[in-house]
From Swiss-Prot:
PANTHER family: ATP-DEPENDENT RNA HELICASE DBP3. Residues 283-444 form the Helicase C-terminal domain. InterPro entries: DEAD/DEAH_box_helicase_dom, Helicase_ATP-bd, Helicase_C-like, P-loop_NTPase, RNA_helicase_DEAD_Q_motif. It comes from the Eukaryota. This is ATP-dependent RNA helicase sub2. It is an enzyme of class 3 (hydrolase). A motif (DECD box) lies at residues 211-214. GO terms for molecular function: ATP binding; ATP hydrolysis activity; mRNA binding; RNA helicase activity. It is found in: Nucleus. ATP-binding RNA helicase involved in transcription elongation and required for the export of mRNA out of the nucleus. SUB2 also plays a role in pre-mRNA splicing and spliceosome assembly. May be involved in rDNA and telomeric silencing, and maintenance of genome integrity. Residues 89-271 form the Helicase ATP-binding domain. The Q motif is unique to and characteristic of the DEAD box family of RNA helicases and controls ATP binding and hydrolysis.
């Protein structure tokens, strides 16, 4: 079987999904429950002595992390951990499994990056940490987070593997003991291909992490590519030792997906947002505009001309629409780029870096950028095409207003289907989205 037959392109979320299961926090069958602000916390392995729920830290030093990690954290300018970091890290560093749902932009990635780096004792030629996510861009971003926090840990080697690039390059990295990574980040299709070919050994894995876990494990009512992804995750999981730490994270975890996640775990610490309304993003102003399909381009042009913003991400539902809209914007002298699965992997990473490094201020994207991508200067998100469900909406608009900062989102509503989704969003999050005011919005209310 060729390598390419194993590589399914999961990274574009353009096929519209139809279900958006309600997400409400339920206490675990085992363990007490503790409310901390927006979070519901429960569980933790019973074989561990004491209770770690409710540990509150005012600074990262209180976590007793390695000195090298604290230096890197200081270099990044971080002073105080977010609430999800306060709740998760003290328990996670004790090797307890973690299932965490927290809204976008609150530092979930740092939970597993800092935890695994703190626990890691690198052995040359051995992979100890395996992190999987559903898109190549997110994998690339996570790898960069590991690089950022391991800058004072010179013996730690990290590599990222995903489809769309020659697999031979990955094999070369894994064939050299000097470059063999202690931490592997990647997408399930490519990782499973490397495991099947016996190029990547997982027999020494001590930490198994899924970021945006619901996207990889939920196959009920979803497109076939999600089912393939779940199959790959299961095969990879079986290739790892039974005794390991498992951590899973997402901004949305429905009641249906939680039991599936927990099948991979042993008595995990469970951290959930109290209820769906808490999933809305504080500091992010959200509006909609009713208009016809033919009016979208003119209205978008008006918004980009009139609104102040640092960077804007514009979501569309297909690669074709992304290309056409990007072309139109550039013809109107807007500094735009497009990111979607139709672009080669090398070019996608190049464009991602251009946008991340503020060389471009406008990005037209499909849902490939809808989850997990953290670009701190984005403070405006526009749904040129409304997504198919409330969960996708939350992930999209969460690109603006990261880590509790201010932001603005505007959604175009142009069809009966859009109106149904809008009502679903309002019902799900118990919020009435206002119509965008004719006079516009005061920039001081969403510009940091």
């Amino acid at each position: 079987m060729s390598h390419e037959e194993d590589l399914i392109d999961y990274s574009d979320e353009e096929l519209q999904t139809t279900d958006a299961a309600a997400t409400t926090a339920a206490p675990a069958a085992n363990g007490a429950q503790d409310k901390k602000g927006d979070l519901t916390v429960s569980g933790g392995r019973p074989d561990k002595k004491g209770s770690y729920v409710g540990i509150h830290s005012t600074g990262f030093r209180d976590f007793l992390l390695k000195g090298e990690l604290l230096r890197a954290i200081t270099d990044c300018g971080f002073e105080h951990p977010s609430e999800v970091q306060q709740v998760c890290i003290p328990t996670a560093i004790l090797n307890v499994d973690v299932l965490c749902q927290a809204k976008s932009g609150l530092g979930k990635t740092a939970v597993f990056v800092l935890t695994t780096l703190h626990q890691l004792e690198p052995v040359p030629g051995e992979c100890s940490v395996l992190v999987m996510c559903h898109t190549r861009e997110l994998a690339y971003q996570i790898k960069n987070e590991y690089a950022r926090f391991s800058k004072y840990l010179p013996d730690v080697k990290t590599a990222v593997f995903y489809g769309g690039t020659p697999i031979q390059k990955d094999i070369e990295v894994l064939s050299n003991k000097e470059s063999y990574p202690n931490i592997v980040v990647g997408t399930p299709g490519r990782l499973n291909a490397l495991v099947r070919e016996k190029k990547l050994s997982l027999r020494n894995v001590k930490a198994f992490v899924l970021d945006e876990c619901d996207k990889m494990l939920d196959q009920i009512g979803k497109q076939a590519q999600i089912a393939h992804m779940r199959r790959d995750v299961q095969e990879i999981f079986r290739a790892t030792p039974a005794d390991k730490q498992v951590m899973m994270f997402s901004a949305t975890l429905s009641q249906e997906i939680r039991p599936i996640c927990k099948k991979f775990m042993r008595n995990p610490l469970e951290v959930y947002v109290d209820d769906d309304t808490k999933l809305t993003l504080h500091g992010l102003q959200q509006y909609y505009i009713k208009l016809s399909e033919s009016e979208k381009n003119r209205k978008l042009n008006e918004l980009l001309d009139s609104l102040e913003f640092n960077q804007v991400i514009i979501f569309v539902k297909s690669t074709l629409r992304a290309n056409e809209l990007d072309k139109l914007l550039r013809e109107c002298n807007f500094p735009s780029i497009a990111v979607h699965s139709g672009v080669s992997q090398e070019e996608r990473i190049k464009r991602y870096k251009e946008f991340k490094e503020f060389n471009k201020r406008i990005c037209v994207a499909t849902d490939v950028f809808g989850r997990g991508i953290d670009i701190e200067r984005i403070n405006l998100a526009i749904n040129y095409d409304l997504p198919a469900d409330a969960d996708s909406y939350l992930h999209r608009v969460g690109r603006a207003g990261r880590f509790g900062t201010k932001g603005l989102s505007i959604s175009f509503v142009s069809s009966e289907e859009d109106e149904k989704v809008l009502k679903e969003i309002e019902k799900r999050f118990e919020v009435a989205l206002p119509e965008y005011p004719e006079g516009g919005v005061d920039s001081s209310t969403y510009m940091a």
